[in-house]
Amino acid sequence: MANSGTGAPPPLLLLPLLLLLGTGLLPASSHIETRAHAEERLLKRLFSGYNKWSRPVANISDVVLVRFGLSIAQLIDVDEKNQMMTTNVWVKQEWHDYKLRWDPGDYENVTSIRIPSELIWRPDIVLYNNADGDFAVTHLTKAHLFYDGRVQWTPPAIYKSSCSIDVTFFPFDQQNCTMKFGSWTYDKAKIDLVSMHSRVDQLDFWESGEWVIVDAVGTYNTRKYECCAEIYPDITYAFIIRRLPLFYTINLIIPCLLISCLTVLVFYLPSECGEKVTLCISVLLSLTVFLLLITEIIPSPTSLVIPLIGEYLLFTMIFVTLSIVITVFVLNVHHRSPRTHTMPAWVRRVFLDIVPRLLFMKRPSVVKDNCRRLIESMHKMANAPRFWPEPVGEPGILSDICNQGLSPAPTFCNPTDTAVETQPTCRSPPLEVPDLKTSEVEKASPCPSPGSCPPPKSSSGAPMLIKARSLSVQHVPSSQEAAEDGIRCRSRSIQYCVSQDGAASLADSKPTSSPTSLKARPSQLPVSDQASPCKCTCKEPSPVSPVTVLKAGGTKAPPQHLPLSPALTRAVEGVQYIADHLKAEDTDFSVKEDWKYVAMVIDRIFLWMFIIVCLLGTVGLFLPPWLAAC
């Protein structure tokens, strides 16, 4: 009653089910047990009495052939300073052990098994050029054993192999690093190496961000060392790796080139701006800071070789330093003057004549020519003769001179006088002068207005016109003279007319438009053609020395000087002084301009020199790596 109440199946119903399950699982379990027992039996048979210290050869004179190969997984690092290459590789080894053979039919068709490598004999193949760490494989993985006695063992290893790294063409360098594998104990008579493949297996290679493997070739070598009489074989793998230069080009080479270009621009900057030395020092400071920043980028310095980029940086540093020295020298030349330096003849010849032609430089001369014309004109005006050496009756010459406006009579006024009323204009135009005797002009005649004085008559009683010179002489009367003469004017034009008898005549200016009138020729005295109001009374002039006169018949008397007033003398001396001063300044200015031009030529020379050197340095930096690669 209790069993029926719980609902459990009767034992008789469970028995057939258990029988069915047992009959179905027995074959599989028996097969697994049989194979496990087969491998166990195989291992017991193989390693019973097996000695892993002896070479796996039937005859002592036989040679164990070890097939060797290498598969690279990663190029970890290339240390230029310590001269070593770190790689992650798989060392492939394969040999035959006659003591580890069996018949698969005796062991449930077991053809291969995995066994610990510590239990079997292994060739002692090591990395000869190991730089750091263990020479041999440290991680002993299991070996794959086949029924014919073939053993395959592929342990992983991280090697630090020594490598002679040449960083001359950094960052465009290409290195050749080798890994030499061979038996450390057995010579060629005991163990011989056979290469599995001629190249390194790169199927599982993980690409590096800085290096790329161009080629990796394995070669078989034999060598007799000094320590031993035997010959030892080895397989050497040569890894040809190339650096990827993009990072270094952006962060190292381009800034160096830009700094070099800034150094070249120093010589293109004019010396007048005064910022040449500032630019040089700024470039030098920027280069110094840049060198401090890139010490971690470029390979660490060694005593073996110096990278081209290091030489280029050193060259740029010297470049900038020389530019500072040359700039100081150029500025010194630029600011030289005749008072401090005398320009040698060879400097003038080389830097003002020869070099500018070679550099296709053309010196502008407009300003210098203008200054020279100004000085020459002032000297002509100041140094002209103060007498008339030629006859004045030639109408053509006089007409041309007067038409050109070359005989102005400047107006000088007494500051104490004032002109309240509008006065007639007294000018000194060409006019007709009668023949006067000295006795006829001894007394002054009142002239109520200009031109109102009656023309004097000759000894025969008829007015006579002669050819004579007229000169408007500036005269500034003093207060006493003005009171005595009754003159109230800002200027007074006095005509000295020379008759045929050599006597000087005095007449007020009288405008005329007669075509036959005599035109006055200008002297070197300051004169003016400006009209000035005046109200004057003609007065007998002081005795003057006769000037050049025309004798009867057109002959010319010897030239005689016209006396000048003190004011005119001082004016002429002032003009002479100004002309001499301007001439001296022009000479100084010319010499200064020559020194400035010499400085410009020196700047241009070093500009082209630095451009050429910069281009050659750049080509020398980029070209050799490509030539070496070819």
From Swiss-Prot:
It is found in: Presynaptic cell membrane; Cell membrane. Changing R223I: >10-fold increase in inhibition of CHRNA4:CHRNB2 nAChR by the conotoxin BuIA. Ca(2+) binds at V78, E80. Pfam families: Neur_chan_LBD (PF02931), Neur_chan_memb (PF02932). It catalyses: Ca(2+)(in) = Ca(2+)(out); K(+)(in) = K(+)(out); Na(+)(in) = Na(+)(out). It is a multi-pass membrane protein. A lipid is attached at C273 (S-palmitoyl cysteine). The modification Phosphoserine is found at S428, S542, S545. The keyword Methyltransferase does not apply. One of its GO terms (molecular function) is monoatomic ion channel activity. Activated by a myriad of ligands such as acetylcholine, cytisine, nicotine, choline and epibatidine. Channel potentiation by calcium is stoichiometry-selective, CHRNA4:CHRNB2 nACh receptor is achieved by calcium association with topographically distinct sites framed by anionic residues within the CHRNA4 subunit and between the CHRNA4 and CHRNB2 subunits. nAChR activity is inhibited by the antagonist alpha-conotoxins BuIA, PnIA, GID and MII, small disulfide-constrained peptides from cone snails. Neuronal AChR is composed of two different types of subunits: alpha and beta. CHRNA4 forms heteropentameric neuronal acetylcholine receptors with CHRNB2 and CHRNB4, as well as CHRNA5 and CHRNB3 as accesory subunits. Found in two major stoichiometric forms, LS (low agonist sensitivity): (CHRNA4)3:(CHRNB2)2 and HS (high agonist sensitivity): (CHRNA4)2:(CHRNB2)3, the two stoichiometric forms differ in their unitary conductance, calcium permeability, ACh sensitivity and potentiation by divalent cation. Cells produce predominantly an (CHRNA4)3:(CHRNB2)2 nAChR. Belongs to the ligand-gated ion channel (TC 1.A.9) family. Acetylcholine receptor (TC 1.A.9.1) subfamily. Alpha-4/CHRNA4 sub-subfamily. The nAChR composed of CHRNA4/alpha-4 and CHRNB2/beta-2 subunits does not bind the conotoxin BuIA. This is Neuronal acetylcholine receptor subunit alpha-4. It comes from Rattus norvegicus. The gene is Chrna4.
